[in-house]
């Protein structure tokens, strides 16, 4: 994928040691991937390759491929649910986690957060999908290795932030041969698509996002 100058903007990589597991590392160790309302993209790249996927005809195929990879991991996800809940309570709840991970406006309200996977060109990434009155935001559960501009490998948490006003549509899909494999495709006005899968509460996540978008359009 050839990237334009606008699309090649990089957030500063941290030089500090980061935690390999769990949410809420030192904020300085979190790498941000955001879609600001100006329609310009800032995103994370590693070894010259973007982890974002431009909308292509094979996007659904890639999503199915990633879902197939999750077969043995879904059981692990369920097992992690209790430990994640304990960590959330320990850190003061989802609201505090959300405000620490992302920039939140005074009038913004967090609706829900759902465990899922985000499909990337590097494979599916486990994390939390936050849905608020202003945006959807994803943060990886574990840190990942990326190359800094100096060529050094650092561990950072992978984050995506998409304002609701930049979402062009949300599509529900499922594997026809494996109906239990369901996906949420979020398409932006700029033509990028994001595939979320492996939800513990798929329909609830879709309904919450649908309601958030409906409320956003009325404002």
UniProtKB/Swiss-Prot annotation:
InterPro entries: GEM-like, GRAM, PH-like_dom_sf. It comes from the Eukaryota. SMART domains: GRAM. Gene3D superfamilies: Pleckstrin-homology domain (PH domain)/Phosphotyrosine-binding domain (PTB). Residues 96-174 form the GRAM domain. Belongs to the GEM family. This is Putative GEM-like protein 8. It comes from Arabidopsis thaliana (Mouse-ear cress).
């Amino acid at each position: 994928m050839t990237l334009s100058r606008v699309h090649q903007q990089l957030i500063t990589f941290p030089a500090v040691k980061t935690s390999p597991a769990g949410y809420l590392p030192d904020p300085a160790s979190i790498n941000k991937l955001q879609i600001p309302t100006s329609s310009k993209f800032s995103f994370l790249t590693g070894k010259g390759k973007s982890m974002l996927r431009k909308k292509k005809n094979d996007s659904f195929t890639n999503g199915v491929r990633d879902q197939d990879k999750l077969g043995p991991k879904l059981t692990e996800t369920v097992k992690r649910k209790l430990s994640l809940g304990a960590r959330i309570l320990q850190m003061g709840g989802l609201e505090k986690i959300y405000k620490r991970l992302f920039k939140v406006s005074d009038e913004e309200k967090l609706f829900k957060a759902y465990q899922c996977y985000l499909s990337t060109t590097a494979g599916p990434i486990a994390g939390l999908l936050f849905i608020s009155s202003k945006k959807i935001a994803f943060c990886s559960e574990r840190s990942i290795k990326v190359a800094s501009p100096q060529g050094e490998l650092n561990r950072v948490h992978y984050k995506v932030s998409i304002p609701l006003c930049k979402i062009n549509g949300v599509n529900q899909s499922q594997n026809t041969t494996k109906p239990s494999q369901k996906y949420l495709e979020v398409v932006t006005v700029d033509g990028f698509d994001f595939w979320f899968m492996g939800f513990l509460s798929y329909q609830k996540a879709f309904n919450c996002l649908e309601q958030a978008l409906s409320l956003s359009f009325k404002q």
